[in-house]
Amino acid sequence: MGKILLAITTYNQSNYTRMCFESLKKLDDDIDVIVIDDFSTDDTVDVCKEYGYECETRDKPMGLTHSWNSAYSHFKSDDEYDYLIIANNDILIPKGALGELVKSFEQWPYSMIVPMSTTNGVGHNPTQSIENYYQGMAPSCNDPKYYQEIQDKILDVKEQTRKSNNLYMLDTSRMKMFNGFFFMMNKNIIHYEQNKTDLFKTDKIMTKNEDQFNWDCLISNNDFPALCKTSFVFHYKGVSTFDVFDNYTEISNNVEEWKRQRDLRGG
């Protein structure tokens, strides 16, 4: 399996970051972890040090897109890595999930592949919901304490499907959009960079950056984001979005896009 750079974006909420790190301790994949912190005011940086993870910090808040582009720069500049994952801090990654994503890349000619999550966790892209493809996973799939059990069940179903010569039913499939809480890319993604350092356009400071990249770069080149139907990542949906708007005072008061987003939700 190729080597993975896992870039986790953070802004406060260190309790969720800690839970994410605990899930990483159980993995046996070949990954390096870098945390890109956007000016947290809690103990997030200290938590990163406690777990031994590199943490890139800011002197002022720059927004999520800036963090994503920083992750891309690390990936592009180091030939050691075959894959880049950009992920929120409010996730739990079960053992086996990353390996399934890599297998999808090895089998299919996609530049970006994403896992399934819960219906709530995938937000605006319900196509990624595990409940579309597996019966009997709910309600336990919505409980974080069962996140590893869900991945294990998926792999059991995969093996049963293989034995019945119906593995095609779980083939990776392309989608019209993806949710930005967790997405994995290979080196082909470099073809879509905006300039030598940025993969994502910088006019979207915090939200809609994945949609813009999807429509402008992926779909327009017939390189759709793809869903791996044998990989599951639990996402605490809502923790890393609107809660941040309420606390990200400097950006929300000075950047027009943030003001617009706050107005849309009555903030």
Predicted regions and their residues:
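Short, acidic, metal-binding catalytic loop of nucleotide-sugar glycosyltransferases
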Residues: E22-I31
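Glycine-rich, basic loop-to-helix element that forms the pyrophosphate-binding segment
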Residues: D59-F75
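A recurrent flexible, glycine/aromatic-enriched loop bordering the glycosyltransferase active site
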Residues: E149-D156, R162-M185
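A short, conserved alpha-helix in the catalytic core of glycosyltransferases
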Residues: K176-F183, N188-E193, D203-S231
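Active-site donor/metal-binding and catalytic loop motifs
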Residues: L227-D246
